[in-house]
Amino acid sequence: MSSGVMVDPDVQTSFQKLSEGRKEYRYIIFKIDENKVIVEAAVTQDQLGITGDDYDDSSKAAFDKFVEDVKSRTDNLTDCRYAVFDFKFTCSRVGAGTSKMDKIIFLQICPDGASIKKKMVYASSAAAIKTSLGTGKILQFQVSDESEMSHKELLNNCPDNAPVRRRMLYASSVRALKASLGLESLFQVQASEMSDLDEKSVKSDLMSNQRI
C-alpha cells in the first residue's frame, strides 16, 4: 500500500554521486520529512577520515562509523531511516583466488524501538525510494535491530561472499546437474564437513543404503 510519500529529486542525484563515476560519497542517509524522502546526510571518504585500504578490512572501519552515525541520528535506533553504503570487500573464489568486490547496499532501517506508526510509514514508502535509486543497482536489507546491521552480518550476506547462499544454490541445482549427466540412479553422498568424505564414512553410507 502506498503511503503517498514523495521522493525528493536530490535523492537520486546524490545516489548517482555514490554509485557512478568517481563515487563522491561513501554513504547516504535518508529520512522522511513532511511526506517527502530527503537526503539527511551524504558523507564522503575524506569526511570519514579513513586513510587505509578499505579492501584490507572489508570496509569495517568505514562501516562502523556509518553505524554510529545512524544510531546518533535515530536516537540509538528508536527512529527509522533509509541508507545506502558503498561496501568494498574481498572474497575468495574457487579457482580464482581472492577478488576485490564493490556492492552498494540499501538498508531499510525500521528498528523494534521505533513507533508502530513510523515503521508503517517507512515500510509503505520503501518501494518509492528503491524505484528512484534503481533496484538493479542495490542489495536490499531490512534492519529491525543493531545485530542485523553488524558488519559481519552484512558481509556474510553479500553475493560471492555468502556461505549460506552458496550452499542453497548448490543444493537447489544438484537435481538439474544429475539429470543433465544421467546420474539419477547413482548413490549420493552429502558432505557438510571433510570427515563426511573419508573412506570409512562413505563405506558406512553405502552399506546403510544397501540394507534399505
From Swiss-Prot:
Coiled coil: none annotated. CDD domains: ADF_cofilin_like. One of its GO terms (biological process) is positive regulation of actin filament polymerization. Disulfide bonds: none annotated. SMART domains: ADF (SM00102). Residues 3-159 form the ADF-H domain. GO terms for cellular component: actin cytoskeleton; cytoplasm; ribonucleoprotein complex; striated muscle thin filament. InterPro entries: ADF-H, ADF-H/Gelsolin-like_dom_sf, ADF/Cofilin. One of its GO terms (molecular function) is actin filament binding. Keywords: Actin-binding. Pfam families: Cofilin_ADF (PF00241). SUPFAM superfamilies: Actin depolymerizing proteins (SSF55753). PANTHER family: COFILIN-RELATED. Depolymerizes growing actin filaments in muscle cells; required for the assembly of actin filaments into the functional contractile myofilament lattice of muscle. Competes with unc-87 for actin binding and inhibits the actin-bundling activity of unc-87. Interacts with F-actin. Belongs to the actin-binding proteins ADF family. This is Actin-depolymerizing factor 1, isoforms a/b. It comes from Caenorhabditis elegans.
